[in-house]
A protein has these predicted regions:
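N-terminal glycine-/charge-rich "phosphate-binding" loop or analogous flexible N-terminal tail
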Residues: 1-39
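Short beta->alpha connector loops
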Residues: 8-10, 27-30, 45-49, 68-70, ...
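Flexible, glycine-rich phosphate/dinucleotide-binding loops
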Residues: 11-13, 32, 72, 94, ...
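Rossmann-like dinucleotide/phosphate-binding beta-alpha-beta segment
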Residues: 108-135
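Phosphate/diphosphate ligand-binding glycine-rich loop within oxidoreductases
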Residues: 41-111, 115
Length: 135
């Protein structure tokens, strides 16, 4: 069975891999070269730097980050060593849109009739804000 090392601070992972992989949950500081040496995959956040210092000599062939960005992952190293990397773009967009609307409601509590909402950018967050405005 494959072995997955998972950063313990990632919410909602729970038993998602039960029956298909052996999982080890570690805090960011516990994800060391020794801890990942016999792992097939890593699931991390930005606190764990995934580079040669961590991955050299390991079996890791898949790194998933539960974040939008990949600044903490040496993509060149991973590419050169056959390690697939995936991230989670847009994963926090609904929460950011909620924050936007909470801010708007805090600043503008009275009548909304006749007002125009301006949204700069219609990426993940802007699209959600616009969709909720239409409802």
């Amino acid at each position: 069975m494959p072995k997955i090392v998972i950063e313990s601070h990632i919410p909602y992972v729970g038993n998602a891999f039960a029956g298909v992989a052996d999982t080890t949950f570690l805090p960011p500081e516990g994800i060391t070269p020794e801890a990942v040496r016999d792992a097939d995959a890593l699931i991390v956040r930005t606190r764990t730097r995934c580079d040669a210092a961590l991955l050299d000599g390991s079996r890791v062939r898949f790194v998933a980050t539960a974040t939008i960005g990949t600044d903490h992952i040496d993509l060149g190293y991973c590419r050169d060593n056959g390690i697939e990397v995936v991230s989670a773009p847009g994963c926090n967009a609904p929460a950011v849109a909620q924050y936007v609307w909470a801010s708007v409601f805090t600043l503008r509590r009275d009548d909304w009739q006749g007002l125009t909402l301006g949204i700069v950018g219609l990426g993940h967050v802007g699209s959600i804000v616009a969709d909720w405005a239409r409802r």
